[in-house]
């Protein structure tokens, strides 16, 4: 019994100690395009009316998706993960 326990302990230590291998970082795809900016064809008041409607329904994930689409058209869209083209004032 004793040699069996020692054998499994030694095997566990050998397999449990990392060999120093590091995962290779994934390279960025050179052909990958940033996500396209979503289109919001409605007015600002329409947006807030939709927000109130979804709040009354308790549909908070839909509000978040709609807000990302709406606010992507403003200069802060780049902070939401969308590529916002340069606009002159």
Swiss-Prot record:
GO biological process per UniProt: sensory perception of sound
Annotated signal peptide: 1-21
Membrane-traversing stretches: none
Main location: secreted
GO cellular component, as recorded: extracellular region
Annotated tissue distribution: Ear specific. Expressed in the cochlea and vestibule, but not in the cochlear nerve, cochlear nucleus, spinal chord, muscle, cerebral cortex, cerebellum, diencephalon and olfactory bulb. In the cochlea, expressed in fibrocytes of the spiral limbus, spiral ligament and suprastrial zone. In the vestibule, expressed in cells located to the stroma below the macular and crista sensory epithelia and in the subepithelial layer of the walls of semicircular canals and maculae.
Record-linked InterPro entries: Otospiralin
Cellular localisation: Secreted
Organism domain of life: Eukaryota
Keywords, sorted A to Z: Secreted, Signal
Family the UniProt entry places it in: Belongs to the otospiralin family.
Role according to the record: May be essential for the survival of the neurosensory epithelium of the inner ear.
Protein name: Otospiralin
Gene: Otos
């Amino acid at each position: 019994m004793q040699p069996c326990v020692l054998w499994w302990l030694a095997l566990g230590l050998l397999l449990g100690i990392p060999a120093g291998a590091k995962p290779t970082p994934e390279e960025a795809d050179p052909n990958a395009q940033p996500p396209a900016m979503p289109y919001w064809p409605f007015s600002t008041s329409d947006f807030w009316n939709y927000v109130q409607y979804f709040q009354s329904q308790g549909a908070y994930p839909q509000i978040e998706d709609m807000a990302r689409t709406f606010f992507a058209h403003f200069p802060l869209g780049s902070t939401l993960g969308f590529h916002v083209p340069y606009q002159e004032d």
